[in-house]
Amino acid sequence: MSWLSLTFKVGSDYVDSVSDQLLEQGALSVDVHDAGEGTDHEQPLFGEPGALPEQFWQQAEVTVLLEENTDVDEIVQAVARVMGISALPDYQLTQVVEQDWVRLTQAQFEPIKISSRLWVVPSWHDLPDPAAINLRLDPGLAFGTGSHPTTQLCLGWLDKFLKPGDSVLDYGCGSGILAIAALKLGADRVMGVDIDPNAITASLENARNNLCDLDKLSFTTALSFSGGGDPADTRQHPVFVVVANILANPLIMLAPVLMSALQPGGRIVLSGILETQADEVLQIYSEWFDMQIAAKDQGWVLLAGRKSVNRTS
């Protein structure tokens, strides 16, 4: 079995209408990404809450998956009509052959060495170091397989600075990787929070797969957390370490929440922040924390600091 893949470029004004037209004509999928990706013309759009980015890239590349027997000329002509031109100036057509997609996907994920004692290992791989702390994580419903620089920055900080017996809040837990790592590294009480219920489901599954003690590790939605409905409510039992690997704008908005969850003298770790955004985040958090850029990787930064011992709220 095989399919056809049709790729062409469109301006931002036509992305919606072209995509709708393609789906109406039977496209199996429509993928839209930055036509300048990987070049000096790349235009990052993060879609962060609180930000107002352009809806689409100025120039987008559209890739359409079609049934093998599709009349491609008809598709191309329909796209041209939507764009108000007589013909598409350029497009590429390739054949997509049936493959073992599971094996192909698995091949993209290799064990990741965070430190001499900490690894992230997909479940289908043998353990490179059975004596190490091995986090078994597979790609799934939520962010956090260990491959992204921000996840590795946070794992590296936990590996170096987390003390046995610490209490930890992982805000924006995604797959639960940081919360699970904290527990494995000796934390006594860990709570993961996420806005997405799917992330809570994924985190619990990953915690069970890693044989975590669920009496010490819990996950809850941000709604339950902010409403105080969780028995591990940090307003009653503030933690010593808060780690949040999200994005800059949500971190700015969450500053009072994260501050109130932390004990006086406690430590805060933030990532998901581009180098160009670091000063803005530092300025907001400096009201409560002695913060600094603690690490950098591939244009991303990790901010770390302590809450003033004189601040209780």
From Swiss-Prot:
It is found in: Cytoplasm. InterPro entries: Ribosomal_L11_MeTrfase_PrmA, Ribosomal_PrmA_MeTrfase, SAM-dependent_MTases_sf. It comes from the Bacteria. Its EC number is 2.1.1.-. S-adenosyl-L-methionine binds at residues 151, 172, 194, 245. Keywords: Cytoplasm, Methyltransferase, S-adenosyl-L-methionine, Transferase. SUPFAM superfamilies: S-adenosyl-L-methionine-dependent methyltransferases. GO terms for molecular function: protein-lysine N-methyltransferase activity. The keyword Metal-binding does not apply. It catalyses: L-lysyl-[protein] + 3 S-adenosyl-L-methionine = N(6),N(6),N(6)-trimethyl-L-lysyl-[protein] + 3 S-adenosyl-L-homocysteine + 3 H(+). GO terms for cellular component: cytosol. One of its GO terms (biological process) is methylation. The keyword Transferase applies. Belongs to the methyltransferase superfamily. PrmA family. NCBIfam families: prmA. Methylates ribosomal protein L11. This is Ribosomal protein L11 methyltransferase. It comes from Nitrosomonas eutropha (strain DSM 101675 / C91 / Nm57).
